UniProtKB/Swiss-Prot annotation:
InterPro entries: MFS, MFS_dom, MFS_trans_sf, MFS_TsgA, MFS_TsgA-like. It is a multi-pass membrane protein. The chain crosses the membrane at residues 11-31, 51-71, 78-98, 101-121, 134-154, 162-182, 206-226, 245-265, 273-293, 298-318, 332-352, 361-381. This is Protein TsgA. It holds the Pfam family MFS_1. One of its GO terms (cellular component) is plasma membrane. Belongs to the major facilitator superfamily. TsgA family. It comes from Salmonella gallinarum (strain 287/91 / NCTC 13346). Its main location: membrane. It is found in: Cell inner membrane. Keywords: Cell inner membrane, Cell membrane, Membrane, Transmembrane, Transmembrane helix.
Length: 393
């Protein structure tokens, strides 16, 4: 594989995470405007975004098999057509049913693209380089989370319709589509089987269950928190721009945290530092919810920084629970995290309807506490130390 080809594939991976990050994170910024557009209460409108999350979950789950049947390049190019159709559906329809269908299609497209992006990084890089590349790739999710709420706030403040935010997100997929030209993708399925030796089956252990629960609770807690921060902030009397700035501050700090921890983590036992980070994140989130308006930006900045390495560390620890990293094990933990994404508004929507945005934030805080408990319990059963021991010579 040429270096030019490797760079193109790596950038496709980066942008695939940016696409999903933009679609998921911008929800909290545009939800109120979309609710007004369809003349619905915000809590009811939030339920329709479950279609986006369901599309992401289904596509990530199915693409483990789909990647061996349909070539990756074909998937990405067909995804571009679906993306254009979905954005057009958002722009030209006033039907709630078509809006939900378009959201589901956007979820399918982003889930397939992100699973391809993850696969490409694991194929292109080995060992420690793979871990650092995955963390850097994941930072594009956060980068999109920093940029697109600002784009949304800019457009909405000028009375530009909310669907233009999704048109802007579509430009990310346009870049992916352009990169597929003149680019060779790794072979999969029957074409790749002859070069792969059979891998002995290995029991996962109870530590994987702890990590799966932690992944689900972390993503559900994180998205439940960040999706309702704008509504919570507006309820305190903050402007739309200031509310959007809180979300952008979180993801900017999250992005810098990922870059910092890609160096820091190698000096510590992963399970121990993960437990410390999960505990700190739970405390910082509580301080944000109960603090004054003046302190909120500082708490959300530190929360973003210290929580940035949690999810990638959960996945990395999962891959270290067996001697040979199991793609199915990693996919299982990723799927649990994606279930957390799908449940975001299923869980928080009714809470907001009955108790308000602050109750949703406190629920997210409780989920972060569960992550801390799972990471602490993992310390008694984790196999990562014995499996990584032979490698340190």
């Amino acid at each position: 594989m040429t270096n030019s080809n490797r760079i193109k594939l790596t950038w496709i991976s980066f942008l695939s995470y940016a696409l999903t990050g933009a679609l998921v994170i911008v929800t909290g910024m545009v939800m109120g405007n979309i609710a007004d557009y369809f003349h619905l209460p915000v809590s009811s409108m939030s339920n329709t975004f479950t279609f986006l999350n369901a599309g992401i979950l289904i596509s990530i789950f199915l693409n483990a098999w789909l990647m061996e049947i349909v070539p990756l390049k074909t998937q990405l190019r067909f995804g571009f057509i679906l993306m254009v159709l979905a954005v057009a559906g958002l722009m030209f329809s006033h039907s709630l049913a078509l809006f939900s269908a378009a959201m589901f299609v956007l979820g399918l497209v982003s889930g397939i693209t992100m699973s391809i992006g993850t696969f490409l990084i694991t194929q292109l890089y080995e060992g420690r380089q793979r871990g650092s590349r995955l963390l850097f790739t994941d930072s594009f999710f956060s980068m999109a989370g920093m940029i697109f709420p600002m784009v949304a706030a800019f457009l909405l403040a000028r009375s530009i319709e909310w669907y233009w935010v999704y048109a802007c997100i579509g430009l990310v997929y346009l870049a992916i589509f352009i990169l597929t030209f003149g680019c060779e993708f790794p072979a999969l399925g029957k074409h790749a089987q002859h070069s792969q030796a059979p891998v002995a089956k290995e029991k996962w252990g109870i530590g994987v269950l702890f990590l799966a629960v932690a992944a689900l609770c972390y993503i559900l807690g994180q998205l439940g928190f960040i999706s309702w921060v704008p509504e919570y902030a507006k309820g305190l009397g903050m402007s739309l721009n200031d509310a959007g700035a809180l979300v952008s501050d979180f993801w900017m700090s999250y992005m810098f945290g990922m870059w910092a921890f890609s160096f820091i983590l190698r000096f510590f036992d992963l399970q121990r530092i993960l437990t410390v980070l999960a505990g700190m994140a739970a405390v910082l989130m509580y301080l944000f919810i109960t603090g004054t308006q003046a302190h909120m930006p500082w708490f959300i900045l530190t929360l973003g920084f210290f929580s940035s390495a949690i999810y990638t560390s959960i996945i990395t620890l999962g891959s270290q629970q067996t001697k040979v990293a199991s793609p199915k094990l990693v996919n299982f933990i990723l799927t649990c995290g994606t279930i957390g994404t799908m449940l975001t508004f299923v869980v928080t929507g009714p809470i907001v309807a009955h108790r308000g945005p602050q109750a949703a934030l406190l629920t997210a805080n409780g989920l972060y506490a569960v992550v801390f408990v799972m990471c602490f319990a993992l310390g008694f059963v984790s196999r990562h130390r014995q499996h990584s021991a032979p490698a340190t010579h």
